[in-house]
Amino acid sequence: MTNIKLNYHKTHFLMSAPNIKVLPEDSGIEIAFAGRSNAGKSTALNALTQQKNLARTSKIPGRTQLINLFQVEPNCKLVDLPGYGYAAVPEQMKLQWQKSLGEYLQKRECLGGLVILMDIRHPLKDLDQQMIEWAVSADLPVLLLLTKADKLSQSARSKQVKMVREAILPFQGDVQVEAFSAQNKIGIERLSEKLDQWFSPLFS
C-alpha cells in the first residue's frame, strides 16, 4: 500500500445535500463522519483541517441536517453526516435525516471508511453500536473517536479507551479506537494517519 500524507488544511467546502440524489458522481473515495447529535463531528473536522469555520458548529445539538461534503483533493472527500439520536426538532424532520443517513451509508459505493464519534464520557449508546454493527457487516473499516477527552484525567481517559476497545471485540471487523480532543489536540495526528491510509488506494 502506498504511504501518502494528504494536506487536510487545504480542505474546502464542496456542497450540502438533503439526500443522495443530489450528491456528486459516486466516484473517488469518501470518508464519512457520523455520530450522535452532540458528539462533536463538526469540531473534529475543524480541528483536522485547522479551519475554525469549515464545518459549522452549533451549541444546539442536531443542527447538521444535511449531508455536507468537503474536498481534500480531487477524488478525496470528507462527509459530515446528519447527527443521529437527540435533536430538538420535530419527529418528521428527524425521520427525514435518518432516511438520508441510511441511504447514504447503504448506497454510496465510494464510501471508503467511517469515523464514528462518541463522547468519551458516554460511549457506545445503542445507536453507536448499531452503526458499528452495520459498518462491520458492510465490510467498512471504522475509527471510533472518543471525543471531549480533555474532560477526563489522563488515567480516566486511558481506562475509558481500554474499556471501549474490550467492549467492541465481539463486533470483530476492522474497528479501531482513539481518544480525541480538539481543544488539547489529542488524537488529531492519529485521525489524519487513518484517513491517509483509507485514501491511499487512489494513489497506488
From Swiss-Prot:
GTP binds at residues 35-42, 62-66, 80-83, 147-150, 180-182. GO terms for molecular function: GTP binding; metal ion binding. CDD domains: YihA_EngB (cd01876). Mg(2+) binds at residues 42, 64. Its cofactor is Mg(2+). The keyword Magnesium applies. SUPFAM superfamilies: P-loop containing nucleoside triphosphate hydrolases. GO terms for cellular component: cytosol. Pfam families: MMR_HSR1 (PF01926). Residues 27-201 form the EngB-type G domain. InterPro entries: G_ENGB_dom (IPR030393), GTP-bd (IPR006073), GTP-bd_ribosome_bio_YsxC (IPR019987), P-loop_NTPase (IPR027417). One of its GO terms (biological process) is division septum assembly. The keyword Manganese does not apply. Keywords: Cell cycle, Cell division, GTP-binding, Magnesium, Metal-binding, Nucleotide-binding, Septation. It comes from the Bacteria. NCBIfam families: GTPase_YsxC. Necessary for normal cell division and for the maintenance of normal septation. Belongs to the TRAFAC class TrmE-Era-EngA-EngB-Septin-like GTPase superfamily. EngB GTPase family. This is Probable GTP-binding protein EngB. The gene is engB.
